[in-house]
Curated annotation (Swiss-Prot):
UniProtKB keywords: Nucleus
InterPro entries: Galactose-bd-like_sf
UniProt-recorded name of the protein: Nuclear receptor 2C2-associated protein
Coiled coil feature spans: none
Role, per record: May act as a repressor of NR2C2-mediated transactivation by suppressing the binding between NR2C2/TR4 and the TR4-response element in target genes.
Domain of life the protein comes from: Eukaryota
Subcellular location field: Nucleus
The organism of origin for this protein: Homo sapiens
Length: 139
């Protein structure tokens, strides 16, 4: 059964937050299921989100909802187990719109993920994400 794998024990980190305003634009808004809140990165050549899960997971899908005009043309999902180095799982290519986009992921058993957003549609390299979901199952 596929379900959301991000839980309260999942540790998340992000590359940046717009104007360091974590209250309004922080990483917690990626997972709060609120249509009114978002993570807004600061400017830069690429942005990323890392997730450390409390147990081994098998990822099957990645869901992302960007704000149109502040999306990424190319993304990379990397993962690892324990202290191993991250390895590339898959590249994905989001569309520049406001829709929730689903990307199938080749079966990967990991406890750490890194999602990197490259080639932002915004001139300054900012990325705005309303929802980030990792779907799959616990191993």
């Amino acid at each position: 059964m596929t379900h959301s794998l991000v839980c309260p024990e999942t540790v998340s980190r992000v590359s940046s937050v717009l104007n360091r305003n974590t209250r309004q634009f922080g990483k917690k808004h990626l997972f709060d299921q609120d249509e009114e809140t978002c993570w807004n990165s600061d400017q830069g050549p690429s942005q990323w989100v890392t997730l450390e899960f409390p147990q081994l997971i098998r990822v099957s899908q990645l869901q992302i909802q960007f704000q149109g005009g502040f999306s990424s043309r190319r993304g990379c999902l990397e993962g690892s187990q324990g202290t191993q180095a991250l390895h590339k799982i898959v590249d994905f290519y989001p569309e520049d719109n406001n829709s929730l986009q689903t990307f199938p992921i080749p079966a990967a058993e990991v406890d750490r993920l890194k999602v990197t957003f490259e080639d932002a549609t915004d001139f300054f390299g900012r990325v705005v994400i309303y929802h980030l979901r990792v779907l799959g199952e616990k191993v």
